[in-house]
Amino acid sequence: MRAVVKAAALAAVASVGSLAAPAAAEPGGRVVGTVKITEADGQPAAADVIVYITGFNEPPSDKVATISQKGRKFVPDLVAITVNEKVAFPNFDPFLHNVFSQSLPRKFDLGSFPKGETKQKDFPLPGVVDVYCNIHPEMAATILVLPNRRHTLAGPDGKFVLEGVPPGEWNIFAYSRRATKPTSAKVTVKAGGETTVDLAIVRGAEPAHLNKYGEKYKDNVQVYK
């Protein structure tokens, strides 16, 4: 199921990467709403959802996103950036980590590095990039590389606000790492206006993954702690 979800999200992002028009110069509008998040067992869930709009391109900002390595976790485990922006991976743990990805938009292997060291990676292509640690199988994160800067992290209550959206009809998406399927809707934005749209998403369990060699993690990975 994870492969299907990732493929659908990747197609949604990548399909606009080279064909989308530049953002319009006229004043943008505001898109607000709520994402209802439910676990697969029907229980309500906290946020940790990225909401984004596709259909147009914007240049990247100068900012560098950060995914920290703390307590054998990636923090945060979901970030959104614009094409050609960078992500920094600082290690705050007193042991080695090895950050890598086998995702088609950006395959990379940062190698092993110790506490106090930070490595960066740029992301020149749109898509969904799943990131793991080759030493600790419990570590997983996702980077959404998007064609524009109209993206945001929904609040703990699922509410979101997207400012400066160009006038027009666009697709709006809600993405969660453990979603059983992607969710999207059409949204029409008017210059200087506000549009409300609500979305719903269902999440499942964290899927298993392979190490950077395409193999299962060894049972004795605790020796690397």
Pin down the residues of each PLM region.
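Extracytoplasmic copper-binding redox domains, predominantly the cupredoxin/blue-copper superfamily
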Residues: 24-225
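C-terminal segment of classical bacterial N-terminal signal peptides
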Residues: 15-23
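Bacterial N-terminal signal peptides that target proteins for export
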Residues: 1-9
